[in-house]
């Protein structure tokens, strides 16, 4: 396991804990311990709980939908409105009830919308009849000026961790600095998120974490200690 990946995970934990602390919110989603099982396939509720535990109400999380063009158009429209209002809009996409991918919609400093899509297998956006393709087409129809970026970053090497990668990718893309919303920055970020077991343990840890207040964050040590603790558990588990 590279030290770079470890550092990326620690930075992600610290940054999202700071968001939680500053907002002063309590995110009490029930913990599903199965998400740490490498063979467990995430449900929509798991993905939403992981994202909400890290980002709270600072983002819009779209519901997972069946392959229904009208519903997809409605969610795409709602997501664009949220993004234009300043909230990162995150869309978990369930492809034929067999694979999760994700769409993150952000507003750049110049006010233009950029749409990131990634499939953790590294495959491209699907055709017009696929759910991913329908989302992208709906976004383009609603907002023709939107910049669509198909990241195609290959991360996943098993058959069960697409939900874990989708949740972590969406969290990472939501946290990408507004001054650095470029395809290159997004690809570089996701390229460091590659170990399914570590990601699952990180996500379970974030769901179980104690509430950390803004004052504790400012005092300095608690966020770092928690990030290190999660990281140590993850790497100890991988070594065994």
Where are these regions (language model features)?
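Active-site-adjacent structural segments surrounding the nucleophilic cysteine of cysteine proteases
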Residues: 22-38, 143-160, 175, 202, ...
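Bacterial N-terminal signal peptides that target proteins for export
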Residues: 2-11
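Cysteine protease-like catalytic core of ubiquitin/ubiquitin-like
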Residues: 80-180
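Contiguous terminal or domain-adjacent regions
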Residues: 169-240
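Cysteine protease catalytic domains with a Cys-His-Asp triad
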Residues: 27-102, 107-116
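Hydrophobic core
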Residues: 13-21
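Small-residue-rich hydrophobic membrane-insertion segments
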Residues: 2-3, 19-20, 29
